């Protein structure tokens, strides 16, 4: 890997790690999702990075994909299990990291440890040439040893410049069909999820997170304002996800346009992902760079 690119990955990782720990300490009863989200996003920018996706907050049975709107009224409550997922980039070189914490309770210690220990096992074993299905097997065994289920349809993912999901998938279960093998210099976000529910996520309500469909041409959009905004979205956010509240801050009256462009397929609106049986879900995530000896954790 080019030294300059390597340094950008390392810096993105250091900033993501600092932002994750900063955000973790903000989560307390009666604090709003929006307040934590905006403070963490500001922290990332103040430390010199940009966001590779909106800060995600997923509580209890929600596994992933929620970022508050500007008018969001949700607050953390005592007894919540909270996943905080943070993404940064330096010049497009991405870091992705997540942590789970419990709000003024200790009843979730085991499920938090299940995903955390599973991540440790994955990091210890990943190396060039290993089948990612074997990593999934080790993750599944570790989570199962705690009495929980891994989520079988959420995976870790490789990262490339300005691309958050770049091809490789790191499962949390043994997937015999996954014959992929990482190679030296691959950058991968590994993120085991553990649950006391079904071990399978389904789509819920909207997440307020969008992504431009780069294959769609703006000239085919008949509505002039929609066409102009789509071009602006693509220019500003490129191939990375963005929050509805970001669009609202930069583009006046964009709410209706977002819905219209999503309906037409020009934008992807991510759904919230929740356990099929409403089980509690924990997550732990680090970004790693594959090297000849195994990997280096950047976050």
Regions found by a protein language model. Name each.
Residues 1-299:
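Active-site neighborhoods and metal-handling regions in enzymes and metal-associated proteins
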């Amino acid at each position: 890997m080019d030294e300059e690119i390597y340094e950008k990955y390392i810096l993105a990782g250091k900033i993501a790690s600092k932002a994750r720990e900063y955000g973790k300490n903000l989560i307390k009863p009666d604090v709003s999702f929006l307040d934590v989200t905006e403070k963490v996003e500001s922290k990332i920018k103040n430390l010199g990075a940009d966001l590779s996706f909106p800060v995600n907050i997923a509580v209890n049975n929600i596994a992933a994909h929620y970022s508050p709107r500007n008018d969001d009224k949700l607050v953390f409550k005592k007894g919540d299990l909270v996943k905080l997922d943070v993404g940064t980039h330096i010049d497009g070189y991405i870091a992705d990291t997540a942590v789970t914490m419990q709000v003024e309770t200790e009843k979730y210690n085991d499920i938090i440890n299940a995903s955390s220990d599973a991540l440790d096992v994955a990091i210890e074993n990943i190396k060039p040439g290993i089948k990612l299905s074997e990593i999934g097997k080790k993750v599944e065994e570790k989570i199962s040893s705690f009495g929980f289920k891994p989520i079988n349809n959420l995976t870790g993912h490789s990262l490339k410049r300005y691309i958050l999901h770049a091809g490789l998938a790191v499962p949390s279960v043994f997937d015999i069909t996954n014959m992929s093998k990482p190679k030296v210099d691959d950058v991968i976000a590994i993120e085991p999820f553990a649950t006391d529910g079904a071990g399978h996520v389904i789509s819920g309500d909207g997440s307020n997170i969008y992504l431009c469909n780069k294959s769609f041409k703006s000239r085919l959009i008949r509505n002039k304002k929609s066409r102009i905004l789509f071009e602006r979205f693509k220019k500003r956010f490129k191939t990375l996800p963005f929050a509805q509240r970001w669009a609202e801050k930069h583009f006046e009256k964009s709410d209706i346009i977002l819905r219209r462009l999503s309906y037409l397929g020009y934008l992807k609106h991510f759904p919230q992902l929740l356990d099929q049986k409403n089980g509690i879900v924990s997550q732990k995530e680090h970004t790693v760079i594959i090297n000849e000896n195994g990997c280096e954790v950047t976050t």
